[in-house]
Amino acid sequence: MQTVTPHTYNTMTSKKDFWKLLAQKGPIVALAPMDGYTDSPYRQIVKKIAPETVVFSEFYSADGLMHSKELQKKALTHDPNEYPLIIQIFGKDPHAFAEAAKIIEGYGITGIDVNMGCPAKKVVKSGHGSSLMIERETAFHIIEAMSHAVQIPI
């Protein structure tokens, strides 16, 4: 399988075709996002062991990324060896998602994963995570807003 590096990713004709490119090479091997675990040092270890792995970050708040330079630095600073790197974000406000997506793209991240699966009560109670599976219109507006805001895959 071809390893996607910042160079190969940046020379792709359409960054939104990232997943298609990977699928052509064979099965996609991915490290799922895990809150409290998939930080940069952990992702770097995984990439040393299995360079073909697509790694995901812990999940970060779209609102938090939009408003906090400190969170942006913590969440989005990464080692070039982590490519391809997908940042997972959560929230419920399409505008916040679009703004966070622009920030994420500005850091040279490969793509964005919208958290629609977290079943934690405190996450669901606030309208985030798996609650978006029920609030399909909100989920649609989130994806739509992000798709118009950035060129990277969502």
Positions of predicted regions on the chain:
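Glycine-rich, positively charged N-terminal anion/phosphate-binding segment
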Residues: 9, 13-19, 34-107
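Extreme N-terminal starter segment of soluble prokaryotic enzymes
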Residues: 27-29
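Non-cysteine beta-strand/loop elements that form the S-adenosyl-L-methionine
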Residues: 57, 110-119
